[in-house]
């Protein structure tokens, strides 16, 4: 994205005609669906930083700490360990706040028996990673453990279903049907996943509405 001023400056400096054709945007976005080997390397580097940060937070999270402080610790660790920026604003939420898909970290203190959800990603030379993980603090209830294991099983089943040449919505259906079949009909609020690259949300997406066929090189 650019400002109008930047657009005019670019047009003047290059002495070119800028085409106002909406379809060109779709052509470019489609080309970006397939990542080059160099792009894949950058995304893997971003994800390696994210993985390392997650393992770090497992040693940090404990009862009495505040969501906002933990968010800052997570951000600092990624930036200190090779991230050239944050892929997006980190979400770190506990207890009831963690049940919100896009929670805002606040001064909520972590308690024994809480789930803590982290949605975060590193940027590396312009390319993004994105990972969501939920961890338990101390002993949790049987219901919490049941739901956690169900979501984990649905995630792993979705991953196992991915291969080239299938509709994206068929992957979403694998995980969604497991959740619904366990008695949580209507509780799957989002799509299963989305592509990423230069932007944190790119196409195609593992959602009920996306019929795009998967191809090698998509992330």
What are these regions (language model features)?
Residues 1-219:
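Active-site neighborhoods and metal-handling regions in enzymes and metal-associated proteins
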């Amino acid at each position: 994205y650019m400002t109008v001023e930047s657009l005019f400056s670019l047009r003047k400096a290059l002495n070119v005609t800028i085409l106002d054709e909406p379809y060109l945007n779709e052509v470019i976005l489609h080309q970006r669906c397939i990542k080059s080997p160099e792009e894949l390397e950058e995304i893997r580097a971003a994800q390696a930083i994210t993985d390392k940060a997650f393992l770090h937070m497992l040693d940090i999270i404990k009862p009495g700490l505040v969501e906002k402080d933990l968010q800052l610790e997570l951000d600092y660790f990624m930036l200190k360990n090779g991230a050239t920026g944050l892929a997006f604003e980190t979400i770190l939420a506990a207890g009831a706040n963690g049940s919100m898909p896009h929670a805002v970290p606040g001064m909520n203190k972590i308690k024994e028996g809480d789930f803590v959800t982290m949605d975060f990603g590193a940027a590396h030379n312009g390319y993004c990673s994105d990972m969501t993980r939920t961890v338990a603090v101390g002993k949790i209830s049987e219901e919490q453990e049941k739901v956690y294991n169900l979501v984990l099983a649905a995630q792993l089943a979705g991953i196992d279903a991915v291969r080239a040449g299938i509709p994206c919505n068929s992957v979403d259906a694998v995980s969604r049907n497991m959740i619904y079949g366990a008695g949580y009909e209507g509780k799957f609020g989002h799509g299963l996943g989305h592509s990423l690259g230069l932007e944190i949300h790119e196409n195609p997406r593992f959602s009920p509405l996306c019929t795009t066929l998967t191809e090698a090189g998509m992330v």
